[in-house]
Each structure stands twice: as C-alpha cells, then as structure tokens.
Amino acid sequence: MNGLETGKVTYALNYLNGEVKFDGENALVIGGGITGAEVAVELAKEGKKVTIIEVMDQFLALPSAVIPAYQMAVEQAGVKVITGHRLDYVDHDQAIIVDRFGNKKELKSDGGIVISAGFMPQLELQEKLEEETDIEVYTVGDAKKVRQIIDATHEGYAVARMI
C-alpha cells in the first residue's frame, strides 16, 4: 500500500486503545473481520460515515456463532461494506481501492483510515528469552499463530493449567 504516510492512517489496536482520534467525516476501515467490524461501529458512533473495504468476496467470512451479531451491529450503525476490493494507495484525504480486475475507485478518507487486516505471529520474544534465560516460556494466542479467539482461549487455559 503506497502513500500511507500522506494520509491519516493508523492500525486497529491503536485506534481501539484510544491512542488516535480523527477529524473529518469519511472514515475507511481496511479489513472486514471481527476487529474491523468493531472499529467501524466505534467510528460510526463518533458520527463518521464509515466504509469497510474487504478483499474477500464476503464480509465477516468466518465460522463463528457471533458473526450475526457483528453483522447486525455494522448494519445498524449505517456502515457501508465494499467487498472484493483492496486498498491500492492513499493520497492525503483520498483512498484508491481496486478490485481483482484492476478497476479502481476513489473514496474520501478525510476522517481517517484504520488498518485492520489481520495479525502476524510474534515469536521473537519467546526465542530471545529461551536463548538468554533458563525460564520456560509459553507463547499462546495470535503471538504463536493467528487463529480465532476460541483457539487462543483454549490454548491459554491449557497453558495456565500446566503452570
């Protein structure tokens, strides 16, 4: 994604932790998973016109019993959802999205862009601690492998019972 430095762009966790507030009216959320839905609803509560951009052909395409509740919350908040598109680049208060055929669309993003496009495992700390100490280290949840929250919950419970 080019041009992120020219726009008002942040990551979902920074926004949800209250580290970032946006002026402007039109906000974009990049990523249509559960976190993206939560961010979109919060932005809508701030009075913004929110659009979710999802690269997959279906919004909230996850096997989970909570999906209908998230879909309803997004719908009730008046959030627009565009599927089958990805963010191509940002140019100040404009975002260019593109579909799989290369067709581009320009969207206003004066109210900020929140990237909620998933997480990556982070094993560096575990590896460093194992190399430098005698402490037994257990890594769980998305820090180990990105999955659904139910997997992380079970894994955390299992490790807690072991120690």
Set out the residue ranges of the language-model regions.
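Positively charged, proline/Ser/Thr-rich regional signature most characteristic
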Residues: 1-7
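Rossmann-like dinucleotide/flavin-binding elements
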Residues: 5, 13-65, 101-112, 116-163
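General small-molecule cofactor/ligand-binding pocket signal
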Residues: 10, 80-82, 138
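Conserved N-terminal Rossmann-fold NAD(P) cofactor-binding segment
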Residues: 67-70, 93-94
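Helical element adjacent to the flavin cofactor pocket in flavoenzyme catalytic cores
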Residues: 70-78
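A conserved short coil-to-beta-strand element within the FAD-binding core of flavoproteins
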Residues: 83-95, 120
